[in-house]
């Protein structure tokens, strides 16, 4: 596992937060810095067909070292970190041989506690890499980036049989844009794995169907003293809309395969208001029903408004559940599960309550389930990753490459 930790710490030192609402891809300059660094490292490692597109997709190939009809496979991670929490001046803490209890995050009152995060009880004796309480860590997905780079180094430096290994690093995954500019044909893999999951053993091939709902409300503002029969309060209409959304179908009240409506932002005045929801559901029919529900709510609340006042609703699908594409190729999951078992890991098949680049890529002709990275609590100050989990991810990547070669020989 030469340089795994060193690589990871170097990558998280670069601020690569993506930014929503920006037309350009990548959305931030910091992502270019990491992409150029990775390009240089791939060149130094001796990979071939290295390309960095104008949209920030970095691709490279580790050529096969054995003969045979071996399918080319790929591994993909994203370089951006979430815009939900600061990713600037990340200052990781390394906690060796974790013995339980609270971990102080920097100087202050912030702690990483097993009371709030019981998974810590399962990680006794391991090396934890945490934040200092002021930023996110960036293990999502720089752990995946470091693991792929380290796996390439292992395959390059050891006589482990493998076919062509394609790797790609994408931008703007956190804002849903990176995979839209991914050239599947140029990539040249028959299938791939994103390395963007969580705890050791996770293997994910189901994700939410996802849509965004943007609501614009135009009211009418007059002096409150003479408002009767004239004022139309856009904020009151917004409140009525949200009151119609099922309260027990929110992110904080759902789990597993349950879908939800999530009010992500709301702002406005009496005259004008805006609301932004996201809709998520694993079941396609329920997903479509949720979209219809939002339209029905808007019509109900907007009924009878003055013609100059209105509610405008725009729904846009973001991505779909990749299950329907991945299950057509069961060997992809079989190989990953066998690789985990060979590395003394129990595979844990679970749905992604979110999305990955792999969801979009699967519908673009590249079946692409998701492998674990060893990280936890993404997108916030309690994010952490275990060194042992990262090492296991490297072992699984290498073993997948080896098993694929054996099937083709």
From Swiss-Prot:
Pfam family membership, one: M20_dimer
Swiss-Prot/TrEMBL catalytic activity: Release of the N-terminal residue from a tripeptide
BP term (GO), one: peptide catabolic process
Sites where the protein binds Zn(2+) 2: 140, 174, 379
Catalytic site positions: 80, 173
Molecular functions per Gene Ontology: metallopeptidase activity; tripeptide aminopeptidase activity; zinc ion binding
Disulfide bonds, paired cysteine numbers: none
Cofactor dependency: Zn(2+)
Keyword annotations of the record: Aminopeptidase, Cytoplasm, Hydrolase, Metal-binding, Metalloprotease, Protease, Zinc
Gene Ontology CC terms: cytosol
Enzyme class, first EC level, given as a word: hydrolase
InterPro entries with a match to the protein in the record: ArgE/DapE_CS, Bact_exopeptidase_dim_dom, Peptidase_M20, Peptidase_M20_dimer, Peptidase_M20B
Cofactor binding, per record: Binds 2 Zn(2+) ions per subunit.
Catalytic activity, EC: 3.4.11.4
Protein name as annotated: Peptidase T
Organism: Salmonella schwarzengrund (strain CVM19633)
Taxonomic classification: Bacteria, Pseudomonadati, Pseudomonadota, Gammaproteobacteria, Enterobacterales
Gene name as annotated: pepT
């Amino acid at each position: 596992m030469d340089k795994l930790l060193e690589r990871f710490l170097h990558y998280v030192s670069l601020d690569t937060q993506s930014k929503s609402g920006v037309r350009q891809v990548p959305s931030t300059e910091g992502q270019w810095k990491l992409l150029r660094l990775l390009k240089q490292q791939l060149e130094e490692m001796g990979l071939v067909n290295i390309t960095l597109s104008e949209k920030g997709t970095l691709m490279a190939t580790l050529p096969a070292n054995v003969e045979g009809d071996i399918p080319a496979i790929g591994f993909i991670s994203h370089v951006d970190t979430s815009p939900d929490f600061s990713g600037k001046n990340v200052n990781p803490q390394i906690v060796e041989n974790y013995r339980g209890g609270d971990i102080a995050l920097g100087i202050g009152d912030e702690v990483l506690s097993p009371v709030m995060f019981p998974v810590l009880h399962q990680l006794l004796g391991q090396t934890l890499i945490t934040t200092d309480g002021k930023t996110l860590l960036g293990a999502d997905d720089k752990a995946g980036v470091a693991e792929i780079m380290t796996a390439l180094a292992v395959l390059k430096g050891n006589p482990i049989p493998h076919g062509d290994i394609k790797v790609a690093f994408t931008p703007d995954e956190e804002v849903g844009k990176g995979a839209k500019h991914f050239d599947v044909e140029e990539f040249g893999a028959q299938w791939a794995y994103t390395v963007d999951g969580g705890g050791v053993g996770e293997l994910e091939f189901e994700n939410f169907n996802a849509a965004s709902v943007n609501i614009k409300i135009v009211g009418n503002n007059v002096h409150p003293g003479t408002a009767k029969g004239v004022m139309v309060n856009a904020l009151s209409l917004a409140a009525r809309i949200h009151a119609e959304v099922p309260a027990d179908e929110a992110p904080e009240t759902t789990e597993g395969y349950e879908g939800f409506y999530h009010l992500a932002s709301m702002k406005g005045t009496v005259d004008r208001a805006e609301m932004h929801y996201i809709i998520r559901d694993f079941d396609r029919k329920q997903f479509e029903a949720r979209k219809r529900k939002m339209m029905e709510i808007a019509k109900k609340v907007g009924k009878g408004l003055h013609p100059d006042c209105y509610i405008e609703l725009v729904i846009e699908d973001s991505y779909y559940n990749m299950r329907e594409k991945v299950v057509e190729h069961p060997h992809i999951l079989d190989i990953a599960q066998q690789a985990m078992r060979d590395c003394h890991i129990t595979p844990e098949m679970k749905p992604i309550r979110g999305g990955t680049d792999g969801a979009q890529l699967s519908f673009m002709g590249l079946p692409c389930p998701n492998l674990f990275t060893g990280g936890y609590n993404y997108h916030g100050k309690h994010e952490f990753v275990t060194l042992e989990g990262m090492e296991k991810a490297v072992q699984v990547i290498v073993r997948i490459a080896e098993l694929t070669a054996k099937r083709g020989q």
